[in-house]
Curated annotation (Swiss-Prot):
Record-listed beta-D-fructose 2,6-bisphosphate binding positions: 254, 261, 267, 335, 353, 364, 390
Subunit field text: Homodimer. Forms a heterodimer with PFKFB2.
Encoding gene, per UniProt annotation: PFKFB3
Annotated protein name in UniProt: 6-phosphofructo-2-kinase/fructose-2,6-bisphosphatase 3
GO BP: fructose 2,6-bisphosphate metabolic process; fructose metabolic process
Amino acid sequence: MPLELTQSRVQKIWIPVDHRPSLPRTCGPKLTNSPTVIVMVGLPARGKTYISKKLTRYLNWIGVPTKVFNLGEYRRDGVKQYSSYNFFRPDNEEAMKVRKQCALAALRDVKSYLTKEGGQIAVFDATNTTRERRHMILHFPKENDFKVFFIESVCDDPTVVASNIMEVKISSPDYKDCNSRENAMDDFMKRINCYEASYQPLDPDNDDRDLSLIKVIDVGQRFLVNRVQDHIQRRIVYYLMNIHWQPRTIYLCRHGESKHNLQGKIGGDSGLSSRGRKFANALSKFVEEQNLKDLKVWTSQLKSTIQTAEALQLPYEQWKALNEIDAGVCEEMTYEEIKDTYPEEYALAEADKYYYRYPTGESYQDLVQRLEPVIMELERQENVLVICHQAVCVCLLAYFLDKSAEEMPYLKCPLHAVLKLTPIAYGCRVESIYLNVESVSTHRERSEDAKKGPNPLMRSNSH
């Protein structure tokens, strides 16, 4: 029997299929030369879990398989009923044993994730406030040849701490049976006091001079960075230096309906249809009603987004990075035309929409890399309206909603709707606002071929 063939992502050559176990297809290229354990450090209510989840979302979005291991969840699995802050007293020897066992269980799962499940980065989300605990954790990656990077969140502003407790902590499962918010707040403050007595901050000038770390001070007002080891740690540092905790709103919308939308064509640079111009006027009215202070407006460099923004009568910035995905030889063709002219390309695109790259064009994976500077700048901003294109919109939305590479191309971003994104404690709230202007639908559902996975005779021509 002939060998099954597949095509190398790097070179367009047919090679025998390798049936040995491999990393999940969502991983793409490995961006780390050895697995990394990120160890969070800091008192409770300092934003460690916020940083852990946000950083994990970013790393997964850029193609680095990452998972959070939250010690609080392990503790709640091991101790079904939370009684009070007394569990966290340093002189509660029985509880200390339980907490250590929970930490060891979490580290065992970290090892499994990084060695057997295709993970590249594990985030160990716990207080880790003593040197003794951190030395125990350091022994684990040394045994397994993992790199370690510490992230310490330091905040002495009582207003920020109280806000974090009220927004996140008192609604945690620990306090589901608590009879009042005040009692929960009081218990949590006493829990913090238990940790404060033995807290030993990271000290890169003395005891911790050899550790790779970043200290995030006062929710990003200052940073201290020490001994960054590699490319991925530099990206982590850069990301953490760009995010902020201030309330803001991000609006995503596509341009008004274009002439190519009406014709069912992809790509190109056509202007707005009459309904597209009507949407642009409706968007202008919507933005005015929002009464947003210092709203920034971003567009691509293509006609449809610029014509949509012109109706707002507001300053706007053009980003080449926001241009629609490049369909290469398939630009300005309908899907039916692509199917007739390039049947193999059509089948490959349907089977593997994220990794598939149009000949001389781009894949969604390429688009994510192109959009990374946009994400960094969005994280720095306050209120922003991004007027973009379908593939660009779904890539940005996937970042904020923590969607996988497989889900990304099939997210719905309809014409003539505004997606209002409001960052919240551990995620993002999304509201879809339709502006009552009719348009064609350009959404394509996942094909049956895509649901089955790639064809054995598969050319996945991305890097």
